[in-house]
Design a protein with these regions (language model features):
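Flexible, acidic glycine-rich loops studded with aromatic residues
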Residues: 359-375, 381-528
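Exposed aromatic-hydrophobic patches
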Residues: 571, 622-628
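Feature activates predominantly on carbohydrate-active enzymes
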Residues: 75-307, 348, 352, 452, ...
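Active-site neighborhood of glycoside hydrolase catalytic domains
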Residues: 257, 271-273, 277-373, 380-388
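Disordered, acidic Ser/Thr/Pro-rich linker "stalks" and the adjacent N-terminal cap
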Residues: 520-579, 586-601, 617-618, 650-654
């Protein structure tokens, strides 16, 4: 029963109780005065469901309410910050937050129990009685959005904030500057937007090395930004702005060329019209630092976030290596190379942010030339960078491209592109199940390191997301998997259960008109006909033993260790063969990797299930031969130890 409630993330502890609570237009909210903002948000949602005004009364008014939702606070609850307790009982719903954010999280749980479509068809809805005690595993539950490559209306961002809140995500990492566009109004430097917010062309879908020749651009005014920050704050979401430096800065340098490496041959900065990594980086001049500090001063005035993201990724060193001025700075500062100049650059910015009582976050390249002490590293490439930061005592946010880049395909590329060029993605493959399977704490070797992992974040890089519909397509439903791995400890995760709940949650997306994708379901771990297959080997990743006999050519079994003599794979057929048949077993992966094929082994059959008769030896990773009618079982027997692992493709019996 608990499994069927469409809650994502799943609460940490949920117990079903007897009975139910009936919510209707007569239900009123009784609230602690510190929760007036949260109460208004809940009341608004209930009004949309019932079509009638919801009554809210402050807690101290002892008015008798026949049907109530009570919102309360209790800092003594033995929960992490952001935790809450909730009961649904026939007399009412009670949500008690450890803090205000916790009460808000509890409200989201309640909203997920209500009907997806508004207004309700019936005048009331019955909620199952239950008790929940819930708290987040991670404090940083983030979603990133690149508004540099493409620009989206602020109204869409507000809706996105709502949807993040619905899933208890709490950090919106707003990527505001790029080679292809500067999107934040800076009063002191108006050309950043007058020039930097517009480009002359964009690659069309389907041809990334081409140009559409259309002028494109836009930016957010400071007034709009303040409104979004306040909107997010009311929903317990912190907006972490990102101002890219020293690289991904071509648009800013095009607007103010004096802050680039002006002394290099062919210097001619432009707002970029193609994707990829571009050479324009800021010059290490005192005027440039003043310029960046002025920008960051306005940024800090707009964004109350403790963390300010300064990019730091993909800053080519070619211009610094060409620039006489940059080389003089390296000499003056005793820097060995351009990597150390990058680190010098980052450290100066870190110091400036510290003077404003802010903390620097940067992509994992901020370790080039030495990681600044108090910096938080956002790990996007190899997990070894996380290890490196943890060793140095720095905090990390896990945002690895292999598991958390939502610009990757979520269904097979051929299938997507057959629907139209607008389904193009940058590349990669991240089905919802793969994201769900990611453990943000996988790099932690002990409890101390676990605590240095602040959380996990999904990335939406938008080269291939020209409009908001495409952003939705890439974000949903994968955002649900992200939310669950950010909220639930690893031992509480369960993909099959999540997948059932996701069907319920997708009804909310559909009711809101979100242009979601259809999740790609991983192949079921079942044999094709109910035959039983087992092995003495262990399974690597998701490559279940059943995949060796599931009727699908694109799945396979993969054993995740070296082989010992007498290791086996045994297939017991659902019913004995009625005629002579030919069996074939093909093992091995790509030849270039030497195989993972079976070097020494026998293919055997049995008619009584216990006496085994050899059909053939494996040769070049393959065995085949004829087996008699009445055969009940097949076995692959390893006859000598081997160093390589083992891949077994579909076993065929014809
Ligand atoms: C990145 O994807 N360049 C952080």
């Amino acid at each position: 029963m608990a499994q069927s409630l469409p809650l994502i993330p799943q609460p940490k502890v949920l117990q079903k109780q007897e009975g139910s609570f009936v919510l209707s237009a007569a239900t009123a909210i009784r609230f602690d005065r510190q929760l007036s903002v949260e109460t208004a948000i809940l009341a608004d949602k209930i009004e949309r469901l019932t079509g009638e005004k919801t009554r809210s009364v402050a807690e101290e008014l002892r008015i008798m309410l026949s049907s109530e939702i009570a919102l309360d606070l209790d800092s003594s609850l033995a929960l992490k910050p952001g935790g809450y307790e909730m009961t649904v009982a026939p007399r009412g719903v009670k949500i008690t937050g450890k803090d205000v954010a916790g009460a808000f999280a509890g409200i989201q749980t309640l909203l997920q129990l209500l009907p997806a479509a508004a207004p309700m068809a019936e005048k009331s809805v019955s909620l199952p009685a239950l008790k929940i005690s819930d708290e987040p595993e991670y404090g940083w539950r983030g979603m990133h959005l690149d508004c540099g490559r493409h620009f989206y209306p602020i109204e869409e961002l507000k809706k996105f904030i709502d949807q993040m809140a619905f899933h208890k995500l709490n950090v919106f990492h707003w990527h505001l500057t790029e080679d292809q566009g500067w999107r934040i109004e800076i009063k002191k430097y108006p050309k950043l937007t007058a020039v930097g917010a517009f480009r002359d062309s964009t690659p069309p879908y389907g041809n990334r090395n081409s140009d559409d020749g259309k002028r494109y651009g836009g930016f957010y005014t400071q007034e709009q930004i303040k409104q979004l920050v306040a909107y997010a704050s009311a929903r317990h979401i912190t907006i972490v702005p990102e101002i890219e430096l020293p690289g991904h800065a071509a648009a800013a340098i095009a607007a103010y060329p004096q802050f680039g490496n002006t002394d290099i041959p062919g210097y001619n900065p432009k707002v970029m019209t193609r994707w990829g990594v571009h050479p324009y980086v800021f010059a290490p001049k005192e005027e440039t630092f003043r310029f960046l500090e002025d920008i960051l001063t306005e940024v800090c005035d707009l964004f109350p976030s403790k963390f300010i993201h300064i990019g730091g990724d993909e800053a080519p060193k070619s211009q610094w290596n060409q620039s006489k001025f940059a080389k003089e700075v390296m000499q003056r500062e005793g820097l060995k190379n351009a990597d150390e100049l990058q680190s010098y650059f980052i450290r100066r910015i870190e110091k400036f942010l510290a003077s404003k009582n802010r903390s620097l976050v940067g992509w994992d390249e901020i370790q080039e030339g030495g990681l600044p002490k108090s910096a938080t590293m956002m790990v996007w490439r190899d997990l070894k960078w996380a290890q490196h930061a943890l060793d140095l005592g720095n905090n990390v946010v896990m945002a690895p491209n292999a598991y958390a880049y939502l610009d990757h395909y979520q269904r097979p590329v051929g299938e997507e592109l057959s629907k139209g060029a607008e389904f193009e993605a940058i590349g990669g493959f991240l089905p919802v199940s793969k994201l769900y399977g990611y453990d943000p704490a996988s790099v932690a070797r002990n409890e101390k390191e676990r605590k240095q992992i602040l959380g996990v974040q999904g990335q939406l890089w938008t080269e291939y997301m020209k409009d908001w519909k495409k952003v939705e397509y890439m974000a949903f439903p994968r955002i649900a998997a992200l939310a669950e791995i950010a909220w639930l400890p690893k031992d509480k995760k369960n993909y099959e259960d999540f997948r059932v709940r996701l069907d319920g949650v997708m009804k909310f997306y559909d009711a809101l008109g979100i242009n979601r994708a259809v999740p790609l379901d991983p192949p079921q771990k079942k044999t094709k006909d109910g035959s039983v297959i087992e092995t003495s080997l262990n399974v690597h990743a998701d490559h279940a033993i059943e995949f060796a006999y599931d009727g699908r050519a694109n799945t396979f079994f993969w054993a995740g260790r070296e082989l010992k003599k007498d290791d086996h794979i045994t297939l017991r057929l659902k019913s004995p063969l009625t005629a002579v048949a030919r069996v074939t077993v093909q093992t091995g992966g790509k030849a270039s990797q030497n195989g993972d094929r079976l070097e020494k082994g026998e293919l055997q059959y049995s008619v009584d299930g216990s006496t085994w008769i050899k059909v053939a030896d494996f040769s070049e990773g393959k065995a085949s031969g004829s087996i008699p009618a009445q055969s009940k079982a097949l076995r692959v027997l390893v006859t000598a130890p081997q160093k390589f692992w083992l891949i077994v493709h579909e076993m065929t019996i014809e």
